Amino acid sequence: MVRVAINGFGRIGRLVMRIALQRKNVEVVALNDPFISNDYSAYMFKYDSTHGRYAGEVSHDDKHIIVDGHKIATFQERDPANLPWASLNIDIAIDSTGVFKELDTAQKHIDAGAKKVVITAPSSTAPMFVMGVNEEKYTSDLKIVSNASCTTNCLAPLAKVINDAFGIEEGLMTTVHSMTATQKTVDGPSHKDWRGGRTASGNIIPSSTGAAKAVGKVLPELQGKLTGMAFRVPTVDVSVVDLTVKLNKETTYDEIKKVVKAAAEGKLKGVLGYTEDAVVSSDFLGDSNSSIFDAAAGIQLSPKFVKLVSWYDNEYGYSTRVVDLVEHVAKA
């Protein structure tokens, strides 16, 4: 049984907790969020506008939120170094704040007594692991790891399958991405990204993403071969990757479908999905796959030039992989 603590109770933190509570060998021991009181934590865990109401019992007292009779200790500490992870015997701290995402800042959890840390955001200094792609490279001496981003988790399994079978010479990715909490309900200040300050619910907003370049970190053979961008669109959840690639080997679209389907039914089952149905984004709400290949949406221009389409629930699929990575780290 791996004892975990969650730091940051936002969209990902709450879903990670929902998923972790379903796993027999994961025990959620503690939760820290300096901005949320216990009654509000319980409320936000129970009611979710996107994923629906939590099916079990949720309550709280002065020092806990209580889910289906299971008491989870709560803290409102701004500095993770001050958390009682040692006395609570925390094996893995899951940091879903988006703040402590580098080795030096995530180290605060180790200083507080956690044995290891899983960061639920891409990191420029912590090693990144994508389940189904490079998790076998994890070694037990690594104390702090990153689960990369939701978009990297969608793109990397597909890119790996395509590269292994046909070779990728170079490629461009676009993610058509649902709104997230960093965006604005009405036009407001966003000094680093002026477009990002525009009304989320009324615009298609071009944005940057490091997701494609990050694939090169988890798949070194693709280093420097992929880059990408994002369009933020007014949907609350579920996003889609368009991967347009120049291949090394000539092939047919039918052959690509066959290869992806075999991977989805084989070694990448549970990470990579496959559909030939006439689907739209809401069909993937609550889908636990990292990436679902849309066979009917892709197109081919020539034997070496294709556009491939893959869906992902950027909240639920990603949060499922966070818990998978926690279990993998605990076993190593």
From Swiss-Prot:
Transmembrane segments: none annotated. Belongs to the glyceraldehyde-3-phosphate dehydrogenase family. The modification Phosphoserine is found at residue 302. One of its GO terms (biological process) is gluconeogenesis. There is a cross-link at residues 46, 63 (Glycyl lysine isopeptide (Lys-Gly) (interchain with G-Cter in ubiquitin)). Keywords: Cytoplasm, Glycolysis, Isopeptide bond, NAD, Oxidoreductase, Phosphoprotein, Ubl conjugation. The keyword Chloroplast does not apply. CDD domains: GAPDH_I_C (cd18126), GAPDH_I_N (cd05214). The active site is at residue 150. Glyceraldehyde-3-phosphate dehydrogenase (GAPDH) involved in glycolysis and gluconeogenesis. Catalyzes the reaction of glyceraldehyde-3-phosphate to 1,3 bis-phosphoglycerate. The contribution of the TDH1, TDH2, and TDH3 to the total glyceraldehyde-3-phosphate dehydrogenase activity is 10-15, 25-30, and 50-60%, respectively. D-glyceraldehyde 3-phosphate binds at residues 149-151, 180, 209-210, 232. This is Glyceraldehyde-3-phosphate dehydrogenase 2. It catalyses: D-glyceraldehyde 3-phosphate + phosphate + NAD(+) = (2R)-3-phospho-glyceroyl phosphate + NADH + H(+); NADH + H2O = (6R)-NADHX; NADH + H2O = (6S)-NADHX; NADPH + H2O = (6R)-NADPHX. Induction: Expression is strongly repressed by a heat shock. Its EC number is 1.2.1.12. The gene is TDH2. Its main location: cytoplasm. The record marks 177 as: Activates thiol group during catalysis. NAD(+) binds at residues 11-12, 33, 120, 314, 318. GO terms for cellular component: cytoplasm; cytosol; fungal-type cell wall; lipid droplet; mitochondrion; nucleus; plasma membrane. Present with 121000 molecules/cell in log phase SD medium.
